[in-house]
Structure formats: C-alpha cells, structure tokens
C-alpha cells in the first residue's frame, strides 16, 4: 500500500514539475505587478539582449527562466522546517552549532594565514552546514557532508576564475562608458555654447548678477522720479485751483463772457420750431436744401454712384483729402440733426422694398377695380330683372305674383386688420440652395 502511494505521489509530483517547467516565472510569481505603472518601453537593443539571454543558459535570470528552475533555486537557499513541538529542541541545537561554528571559524582563520590556497565557504554554505540530514522524495536519508566535500572546491575555483575575467571586462566597460560620457558632455556644451573652464563660468555668473543689480537700480530710480513728478503735479494743480478761485472772486459776473468759438453743440430746437446753429450764434434758416427729396431713394443712389465715379477718376492723394473733408462735413451735418443717405447697401435695400410694396399695391388695386366693375354690372342686371318682374306682376293676384329680388350688395372683400402681424417663414428663399 505504501509503495503504491509513493508511486502515485511521485507521478503527481513529476506531472506538477512538468507544468511548472512550462510556466514562465514572471507570470507565476508576478513580483513586478506592483511596479507595473513604472514600466517603460524597451529599446531594440534591450529586446535583442533579452532574446539572447533566453537561449544562453548562463545568462538566464528569474524573468527568462521557468517556474520550476526558480523554485529549485529557492529550495537551495531555504531554511529547514521546524516540526511542531520541537521548537525548544531546535533552538538548543542552533546555539550549540553557533558555539561550534565560532571555534571552527577561528581555526579556519589560522589555516588561511598558513595556506592561502584554501578558500573560505560562503554564507549560504554556512547555513547549509547547520543542516546535517536531508531527505529525498522516497524518505531516505542523504548525508550532506559527503555531497559538500565533492562539490565545494570545484565551485570556489570556478568563481575565482570568473571574477578575474569579469574584473578586466568591467574595467574596460567603465573606461568606454567614461569616454562616451565625456564626449557627450563636451558635445552638449558646444551646442549650448557653455563656457569651458570654471573661471569663465564664474565670470559669466558675476556678469549676470551685475546686470540684475543695474536693472533693479534703474527701476528704483524711475519709481522715485515718477513719485517726484506726481508730487510736483499735485502742487501745480493746487496752485492753479487757488489762482482760479481768486480770479472768480475778483471778476464776479465775467463768466458770461466766456469764448465758446471752439465748442460745437448738437441740434437744439426751440418751442416755436426754430433751430439754433451748432455754435449757438444765430438761428438756422429753414431754406430749401439742395439735392433730391428725402423719399426719392433712386435719386440718392444715382447721386452716390456719380460721386463715387468722380472720386475714382482722381489721384490717390486727392482721394484721401476728399474723404477726410467729407468725413468732417458728415460729422457736422449729423451734429445738426440732418440725416445723411450715403450707404449704397441700405439705399438698394430701400429701393427693393419700395418696388415690392408698389407691386403689391398694384395687384390690390387691380383686384379692387375688378370687384367694383363686377358689382356695377351685377347691380344693373338685378335692376333690369326686378323691372321685368314688376311689369309681369301687373294684373295678377298677390298669391300668384313673382317675388322681387333683393338689391345686389356685391362680394364682400375681406378687410385687412390694422397693425403688423408678420408672416410665416415656411417657404424657401428664391435663389437659395436646392
């Protein structure tokens, strides 16, 4: 029974080992998932080196190796399991081993002084010395000392030979890296035009500090000058106010004689309808103004086009002078309250609106004329018919007489309501996108 159980356990363990050998260690242990957000994209050289590491068994690390290999490595460094109830016993054994290891350590030091070829064991091997018995899968004891004696010297020699080669290689790599770094630093300095020596750097810093100090002093001086100027201005204003107040007291009624030649006023209309000029010196004459009437939009447009053609025929300098003159004239007329019609776009819009209104009124007038003519003709017919009925009814009894027709009123034309109600903008605009 025990043999069959052992066989089954071995089979199961070998199956699990096979599965672990297929799983990469980085997915099984997942130690780098905590620092995953710090991950950066590998360069082409790094990815190439990783591929080479996978193929080379000496350069393989925990990322490239399988889960089984990592587990075996951890088993080598693992400490022995303490069974429950044997903790104190284990502690006593450990103290005894520590005491013996101290004595052995002293003897080993003496041996190293006498014989330099003998190599001291590593810390991991010292921990392995504490374990005297190791069990295999079947439960059989394997003595550790015999195994240790066979493997220890070869490993130490290999390590020593590797370290010497590595030291030489490291020195070469360090020298190459230093030379590269120096070259890069010098290249960057030349690009940003940095000063070469330390003295030049210090001189540049001093120069910058001096410039800053000079700027600060200049700004302070400007502020002081502004303050002095503001104080002097305030003193001048105070003195002017005092002088003005004295003059007012002296002159008295001479305020009415203030010269208002340079002052322009807007359109001022009196109760009787008379209007004053912009300088308030005289009344404005209500004479007939030159040019077309206010509502004659077409004439205004023609006048504007003629003026534009005349302006285009002149030189550039004359055009500029004329425009400046017209600008002032326009401002003066607007100040007087005269409406100026010199916007071509608005004039054309007004003409278009007036023409549309004319067309609409023409249609309404023709419709009204037709209705009036129809009513006149219908009334005439009705009258003639009533006269005929009246003639026919003579000599007949009342119950046999034909009734007279009523007076023709005409078709009721729907009256338009007062006010503007707008229209529904449902139809598409003419000439719009189809």
Swiss-Prot record:
Keywords: Acetylation, Coiled coil, Nucleus, Ribosome biogenesis, rRNA processing. Residues 162-230, 293-360 form a coiled coil. Residues 32-58, 70-79, 95-105, 144-178, 375-392 have a biased composition (Basic and acidic residues). GO terms for biological process: ribosomal large subunit biogenesis; ribosomal small subunit biogenesis; rRNA processing. It comes from the Eukaryota. InterPro entries: Rrp14/SURF6_C (IPR029190), Rrp14_N (IPR029188), SURF6 (IPR007019). The modification N-acetylserine is found at residue 2. Residues 393-408, 425-434 have a biased composition (Basic residues). It is found in: Nucleus, Nucleolus. One of its GO terms (molecular function) is RNA binding. Pfam families: RRP14 (PF15459), SURF6 (PF04935). Residues 32-257, 375-434 are annotated as: Disordered. Residues 121-140, 220-241 have a biased composition (Acidic residues). GO terms for cellular component: nucleolus. Involved in ribosome biogenesis and cell polarity. Required for the synthesis of both 40S and 60S ribosomal subunits and may also play some direct role in correct positioning of the mitotic spindle during mitosis. Component of the 90S and 60S pre-ribosomal particles. Belongs to the SURF6 family. This is Ribosomal RNA-processing protein 14.
């Amino acid at each position: 029974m025990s043999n069959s159980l052992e066989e089954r356990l071995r089979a199961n363990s070998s199956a699990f080992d096979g599965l672990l050998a297929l799983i990469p260690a980085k997915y099984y242990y997942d130690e780098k998932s905590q620092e995953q957000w710090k991950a950066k994209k590998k360069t082409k050289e790094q990815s190439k080196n990783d591929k080479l590491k996978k193929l080379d068994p000496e350069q393989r690390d925990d990322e490239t190796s399988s889960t089984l290999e990592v587990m075996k490595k951890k088993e080598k460094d693992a400490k022995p399991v303490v069974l429950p109830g044997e903790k104190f016993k284990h502690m006593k054994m450990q103290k005894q081993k520590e005491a013996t290891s101290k004595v052995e350590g002293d003897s080993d030091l003496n041996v190293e002084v006498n014989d330099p070829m003998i190599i001291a064991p590593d810390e991991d091997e010292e921990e392995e010395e504490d374990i005297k018995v190791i069990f295999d899968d079947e439960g059989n004891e394997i003595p550790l000392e015999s195994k240790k004696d066979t493997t220890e010297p070869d490993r130490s020699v290999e390590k020593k030979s590797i370290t010497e080669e590595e030291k030489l290689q490291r020195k070469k790599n360090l020298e190459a890296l230093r030379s590269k770094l120096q070259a890069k630093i010098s290249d960057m300095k030349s690009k940003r035009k940095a000063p070469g020596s330390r003295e030049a750097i210090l001189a540049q810093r001093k120069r910058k500090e001096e410039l800053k100090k000079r700027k600060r002093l200049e700004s302070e001086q400007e502020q002081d000058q502004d303050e002095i100027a503001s104080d002097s201005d305030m003193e001048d204003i105070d003195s002017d106010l005092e002088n003005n107040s004295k003059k007012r007291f002296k002159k008295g009624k001479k305020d009415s004689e203030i010269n208002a030649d340079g002052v322009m006023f807007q359109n001022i209309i009196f109760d009787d309808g008379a209007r004053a000029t912009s300088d308030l010196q005289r009344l404005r004459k209500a004479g007939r103004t030159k040019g077309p009437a206010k509502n004659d939009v077409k004439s205004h447009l023609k006048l504007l086009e003629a003026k534009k053609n005349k302006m285009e025929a002149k030189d550039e300098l004359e055009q500029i002078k004329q425009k400046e003159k017209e600008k002032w004239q326009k401002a003066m007329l607007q100040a007087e309250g005269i409406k100026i019609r010199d916007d071509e776009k608005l004039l054309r819009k007004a003409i278009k609106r007036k023409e549309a209104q004319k067309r609409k009124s023409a249609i309404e007038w023709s419709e009204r004329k037709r209705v009036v003519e129809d009513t006149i003709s219908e009334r005439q017919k009705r009258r003639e018919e009533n006269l005929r009925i009246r003639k026919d009814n003579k000599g007949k009894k009342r119950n046999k007489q034909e009734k007279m027709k009523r007076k023709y009123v005409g078709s009721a034309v729907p009256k338009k309501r007062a006010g503007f109600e707008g229209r529904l903008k449902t139809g598409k605009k003419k000439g719009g996108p189809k």
